Amino acid sequence: MRIWAYGDDINTDMLFPGKYTYTCAKPDEIKPHLLEDLDPEFAKAVQPGDIIFAGKNFGCGSSREQPVVGLKAVGIEAIVAKSYARIFYRAAINQGLLLIECPEAVDAYARDMTQSSSIGIVSQSVTVQINLKESSVTVGTQTFKFPTLPPEILAIRDAGGLLEYTRAKLRRSGSRGQGSGGSGQTPRTPEPQNPRP
């Protein structure tokens, strides 16, 4: 597991260039272009289980699914940021991508790495552990708490995304979306703790 570190206001065009919006829709088409303009090494070197640390307002900008779909497809384990743009936050939950809001952990990691606020850094020297049961992030020897994630978010993540979660829920109810065993309604996606426009 490695850490990719970035600064504030990482927008969706930085995560996935807008020029590919109408030509790349499938995960395998999206992956080679992730962070292409911000960090050209990311798509070539990212590995399943890696974590992204970032500053404020991560995922701001235009509303597109490709950034979230791509990050999930390359195996990003989690994103730890100071805050998220509202639309990105909701899209990430729908795809089953784990987002954690913990400014203190981000600051601690930045201090340990003495990093630039705008350039991605790959590190294996600083140990990072995420404990969902305890709602904590450990950076080196320091542990920081983050707001407890609602059970619905964790269930959607464990299922692999909102679509898979809903399908499994309908199968369990035996309704197939039409019977009386369930409402057939898509669960409401929870909001971020400190949403951005």
Residue ranges and their predicted role:
Residues 173-197:
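Intrinsic disorder/low-complexity segments
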Residues 14, 29, 33, 91, ...:
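Alpha-helical scaffold segments in soluble metabolic enzymes
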Residues 119, 125, 136, 184-187, ...:
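A detector of low-complexity, intrinsically disordered, Ser/Thr/Gly/Pro/Ala-rich segments
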Residues 16, 22-134:
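Feature captures the catalytic cores and cofactor-binding loops of soluble hydro-lyases/lyases
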Residues 9, 62, 160-162:
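Conformational gate/switch positions in structured elements
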Residues 124-172:
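Long, charged alpha-helical interface segments
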Residues 1-20, 24, 164-172:
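N-terminal, positively charged, Ser/Thr/Ala/Gly-biased leader segments
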